[in-house]
């Protein structure tokens, strides 16, 4: 029965009320943009269910602090993870570029948005690929703007659409 503890445990409620309890003990989770917002909620939920969670974010905090648009930062982040674990079970690409539109976004800012939203997720997965556990999962977070843009959010839309 102990081997079942490593498997997700589902508790089903009545009618439409389905409560799902998942256990992630001994799982390693990587979250980009996990210092606040959706990324923080994702990281907190995995931690609450027993996972070892590695967060990278530009915002200062109790996590790896760095700008994922920089290749050497991603390499250092992965080196830190791999020095402690030889496998990764989940990669959550959640970091978001700035949200600027065509009227105010410079060429350099647009390139930065693409680096955060496209290049960084690609390179992070490439670096971690040799360490992905059997059954590992990669989740790329996006928004509805990848299907229906709004004015003055073009940089965000372009970066989010590419990794969907």
Regions found by a protein language model. Name each.
Residues 139-162:
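Catalytic loop of short-chain dehydrogenase/reductase
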Residues 125-126:
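A short, exposed helix-loop element centered on a Lys and neighboring polar residues
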Residues 22-53:
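Canonical Rossmann dinucleotide-binding motif of NAD(H)/NADP(H)-dependent dehydrogenases/reductases
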Residues 58-72:
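Rossmann-fold cofactor-recognition segment
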Residues 10-28:
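Flexible N-terminal pre-Rossmann segment of NAD(P)-dependent oxidoreductases
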Residues 101-111:
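Substrate-binding pocket helix/loop in short-chain dehydrogenase/reductase
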Residues 94-99:
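Conserved NAD(P)H cofactor-binding loop of Rossmann-fold oxidoreductase domains
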């Amino acid at each position: 029965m102990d081997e079942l503890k490593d498997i997700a445990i589902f508790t089903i409620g009545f009618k439409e009320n389905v409560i799902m309890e998942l256990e992630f003990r001994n799982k390693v989770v990587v979250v980009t943009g996990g210092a606040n917002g959706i990324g923080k909620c994702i990281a907190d939920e995995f931690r609450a269910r027993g996972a070892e969670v590695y967060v990278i974010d530009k915002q200062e905090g109790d996590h790896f602090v760095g700008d994922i648009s920089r290749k050497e930062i991603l390499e250092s982040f992965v080196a830190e993870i791999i020095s402690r674990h030889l496998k990764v079970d989940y990669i959550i690409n959640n970091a978001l570029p700035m949200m600027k539109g065509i009227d105010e976004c410079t060429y350099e800012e647009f390139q930065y948005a693409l680096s955060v939203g496209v290049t960084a997720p690609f390179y992070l997965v490439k670096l971690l690929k040799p360490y992905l556990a059997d059954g590992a999962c990669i989740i790329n977070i996006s928004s509805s703007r990848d299907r229906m843009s709004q004015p003055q959010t073009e940089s965000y839309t372009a970066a989010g659409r590419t990794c969907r």
